[in-house]
């Protein structure tokens, strides 16, 4: 059945969030009102998916309808706490705007004309087109992208079986800079022991809005215990408002301040010399690189007074090793992302806070923990080994630049899909398969994305909603929500081993299916069935658990299991508790720590303050240093963005409860700037640059620099399902140019714009 936009269903109101159901044939959307509270009640443990951190949860269900979600008390770091996004999962499941049947585009891309089809027809047509593209252009011409985490593993399994090396997560548009910096220096990332820190410095990392429930609670605990917090941020974020000090740093000035702090620590010998000598390489090159980066120099670069830089550095060092410079998350402020994140890790290294209470630490999975304990404390997870699984032979499109070798091995440079499609280099991309990925909100330069999808031969979107990106697809495959599916066991180890399990809470609505099942069935239609030896998720879970039925039962009952005691390798009291628990543990060092067991997966086996590998890949990048770059023109204002506590990037603006909580992203304007432009709060304004033009509303506030404008990201969608949050506000991607930072491969989230009244 085919239908035009004029014949589509009319909108049904849910508060202010569901402005219209958009353009769908009858039966394509969900109709599932929440049942009353009378009836059989169950509590099911699972994992949240309202953001990428996957907090353990419990869902209360009445008559097969989810009515309440809370944190899982079996997970002590979080307990029953949950954020607004996690609690809104009820609204997600029962949203009448959900896609619940496969659909095929019948009109121009993005115009919203769809036809309901069967799963079999969808699989047959998509597989036929993929195989035709493979035959003509090679399997590498099909790109696969997904949100990070469990959603990506099954899609990437399909990509590998199909023969394509081009798999991507959203990492290059969000957290990759931090992870790549850690990989360059140490071979792997580090976590924060926030609850026990005495001093924390943040460069734009806003844990009170970019919420990670456990870390956010730890931050509150640290502040209650008297820890000092210092925020360097161009705007007064929620974290800045709760910090002891807020310094309105110039956008892009972070690296200069970090280099100056390093200069002070080395010049005044405030660093942990014994740690540096034992665990690092390249200190001499680092010291030479920061010899001239004085606080006075940085003050001119960043608008932070020199005496503030000196004082904060001294205070930070005085609290070491129980002190942290937060490595951050989504915040590519400039082209110098890789060096900024490296300098943050470098300051932590100079503090000697690695594997110390209130510092940074390596996560300890079952294999590591069991080895140290001298016995099997926690079960290890078996890795799926598929016999004769093919290995793609073509080069990845993002490895045309060798500097991206680190991110290519992880989430990849997703915006390279645009480059390849538009330039046909190193070879053309002809198809794009997306799983819960909304690049139209997260990738910069929206106009380039439109050009990209318009010239592709095939675009497939697997999603819960008709997102802005899904609106440009040829086929929509309805995925069920995280509360309607089972998934693999997740390793959530931190200071000791821990596993968690996402399991089905309620039955799927309509014909929606789990993404693992969708990609498995498409793989079978592609003739790749031999690479799918499992029949259901329970079989795969049991394989991971090495056939341990008792463990599987316990994990399903509790949803979260952990083993052992917290272990910090260089903290004597922590090691004492560990060895008391496990008498057969390996011998401690003479100082009663496990300092000799601290290893790093870098080429030298140490923390590399100077990277010979990076210097070879990109001359001049061996050590961090400031380089000339421009974020805006002289007549422009800085344009920056950030996260808000009630939304996740561009993913949750469709969820009714969250859309009601926040449905617009007013532009923060300093009173001085507003007066110069004749602008008042609530006025309609234009932001414009060479990339695009956006209309929004002004919010005049002193909580922003006079030369800077700020908005929350994820609003102002120009296609897809219509809610209050998607139809209002500034679309950030329409104002950010297509700029990729070196080495990290991340998109730059700062630009220049002009401001005027509408």
Swiss-Prot record:
Predicted to be exported by the Tat system. The position of the signal peptide cleavage has not been experimentally proven. Residues 1-30 form the signal peptide. Coiled coil: none annotated. InterPro entries: Asp_de-COase-like_dom_sf, MoPterin_dinucl-bd_dom, Mopterin_OxRdtase, Mopterin_OxRdtase_4Fe-4S_dom, Mopterin_OxRdtase_prok_CS, MopterinOxRdtase_cofactor_BS, Prok_Mopterin_Oxidored, TAT_signal. GO terms for cellular component: periplasmic space. Its EC number is 1.8.5.5. Its cofactor is [4Fe-4S] cluster; Mo-bis(molybdopterin guanine dinucleotide). Residues 41-97 form the 4Fe-4S Mo/W bis-MGD-type domain. Keywords: 4Fe-4S, Iron, Iron-sulfur, Metal-binding, Molybdenum, Oxidoreductase, Periplasm, Signal. It catalyses: a quinone + hydrogen sulfide + sulfite + 2 H(+) = thiosulfate + a quinol. PROSITE patterns: 4FE4S_MOW_BIS_MGD, MOLYBDOPTERIN_PROK_1, MOLYBDOPTERIN_PROK_2, MOLYBDOPTERIN_PROK_3, TAT. It is found in: Periplasm. The keyword DNA repair does not apply. GO terms for molecular function: 4 iron, 4 sulfur cluster binding; metal ion binding; molybdopterin cofactor binding; oxidoreductase activity. Composed of three subunits: PhsA, PhsB and PhsC. Component of the PhsABC thiosulfate reductase that catalyzes the reduction of thiosulfate to sulfite and hydrogen sulfide, with menaquinol as the sole electron donor. Proton motive force (PMF) is required to drive transmembrane electron transfer within the reductase. The PhsA subunit contains the active site molybdenum-bis(molybdopterin guanine dinucleotide) (Mo-bis-MGD) cofactor. Belongs to the prokaryotic molybdopterin-containing oxidoreductase family. This is Thiosulfate reductase molybdopterin-containing subunit PhsA. It comes from Salmonella typhimurium (strain LT2 / SGSC1412 / ATCC 700720). The gene is phsA.
């Amino acid at each position: 059945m085919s239908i035009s936009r004029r014949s589509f269903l009319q909108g049904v109101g849910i508060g202010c969030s569901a402005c219209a159901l958009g353009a769908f044939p009858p039966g394509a959307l969900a109709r599932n009102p929440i049942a009353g509270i009378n009836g059989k009640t169950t509590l099911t443990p699972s994992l949240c998916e309202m953001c990428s951190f996957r907090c353990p949860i419990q869902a209360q269900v009445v008559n097969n309808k989810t009515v309440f979600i809370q944190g899982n008390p079996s997970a002590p770091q979080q307990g029953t706490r949950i954020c607004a996004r996690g609690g809104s999962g009820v609204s997600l499941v029962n949203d009448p705007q959900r896609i619940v049947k496969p659909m095929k585009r019948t009109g121009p891309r993005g115009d919203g004309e769809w036809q309901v089809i069967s799963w079999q027809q969808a699989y047959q047509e998509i597989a036929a087109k993929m195989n035709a593209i493979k035959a003509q252009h090679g399997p590498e011409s099909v790109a696969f992208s997904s949100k990070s985490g469990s959603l990506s593993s099954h899609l990437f399994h399909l990509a590998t079986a199909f023969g394509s090396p081009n798999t991507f997560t959203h990492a290059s548009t969000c957290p990759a800079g931090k992870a790549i910096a850690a990989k360059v220096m140490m071979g792997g990332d580090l976590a924060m022991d926030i609850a026990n820190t005495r001093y924390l410095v943040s460069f734009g990392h806003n844990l009170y809005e970019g919420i990670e429930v456990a870390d956010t609670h730890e931050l509150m605990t640290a502040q209650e215990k008297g820890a000092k917090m210092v925020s360097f941020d161009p705007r007064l974020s929620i974290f800045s408002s709760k910090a002891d000090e807020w310094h309105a740093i110039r956008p892009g000035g972070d690296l200069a301040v970090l280099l100056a702090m390093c200069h002070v620590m080395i010049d005044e010998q405030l660093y942990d010399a014994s740690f540096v000598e034992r665990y690092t390489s390249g200190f001499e090159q680092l010291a030479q690189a920061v010899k001239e980066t004085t606080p006075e120099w940085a003050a001119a670069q960043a608008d932070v007074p020199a005496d503030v830089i000196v004082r904060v550095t001294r205070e930070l060092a005085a609290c070491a090793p129980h002190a942290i410079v937060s490595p951050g998350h989504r915040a590519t402020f400039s082209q110098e992302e890789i060096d900024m994140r490296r300098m943050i890790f470098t300051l932590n290294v100079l503090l000697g806070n690695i594997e110390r209470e209130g510092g940074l630490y390596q996560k300890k999975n079952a294999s590591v923990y069991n080895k140290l304990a001298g016995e099997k404390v926690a079960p290890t997870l078996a890795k799926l080994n598929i016999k004769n699984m093919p290995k793609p032979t073509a080069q990845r499109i993002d490895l045309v630049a060798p500097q991206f070798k680190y991110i290519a091995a992880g989430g990849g440079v997703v915006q390279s899909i645009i480059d390849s499609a538009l330039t046909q280099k190193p070879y053309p991309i002809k198809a794009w398969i997306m799983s819960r990925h909304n690049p139209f909100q997260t990738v910069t330069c929206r106009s380039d994305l439109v050009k990209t999808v318009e010239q592709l031969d095939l675009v497939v979107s697997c999603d819960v909603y008709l997102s802005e990106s899904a609106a440009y697809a040829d086929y929509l495959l309805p995925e069920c929500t995280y509360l309607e599916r089972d998934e693999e066991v997740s390793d959530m180890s931190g200071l000791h081993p821990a596993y968690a399990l996402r399991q089905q809470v309620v039955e799927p609505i309509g014909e929606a299916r789990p993404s693992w099942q969708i990609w498995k069935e498409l793989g079978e239609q592609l003739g790749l069935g031999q690479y799918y030896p499992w029949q259901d998720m329970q079989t795969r879970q049991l394989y991971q658990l090495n056939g341990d039925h008792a463990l599987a039962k316990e994990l399903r009952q509790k949803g979260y299991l952990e083993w052992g005691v917290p272990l910090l390798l260089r903290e004597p009291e922590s090691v004492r508790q560990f060895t008391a628990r496990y008498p057969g543990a390996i011998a401690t060092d003479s100082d009663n720590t496990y300092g000799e067991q601290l290893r790093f997966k870098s080429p030298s086996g140490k923390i590399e303050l100077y990277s010979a590998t990076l210097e070879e890949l990109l001359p001049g990048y061996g050590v961090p240093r400031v380089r000339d770059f421009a974020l805006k023109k002289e007549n422009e204002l800085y344009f920056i963005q950030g996260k808000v506590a009630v939304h996740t990037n561009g993913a949750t603006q469709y969820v009714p409860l969250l859309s009601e909580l926040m449905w617009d992203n007013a532009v923060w304007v300093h009173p001085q700037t507003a007066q110069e432009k004749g602008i008042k709060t609530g006025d309609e304004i234009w932001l414009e640059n060479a990339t695009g033009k956006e209309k929004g509303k002004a919010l005049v506030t002193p909580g922003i620099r006079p030369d800077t404008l700020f908005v929350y990201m994820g609003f102002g969608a120009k296609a897809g399902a219509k809610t209050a949050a998607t139809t209002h506000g500034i679309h950030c991607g329409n104002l950010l140019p297509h700029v990729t930072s070196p080495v990290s491969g991340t998109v730059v989230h700062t630009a220049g714009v002009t401001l005027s009244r509408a």
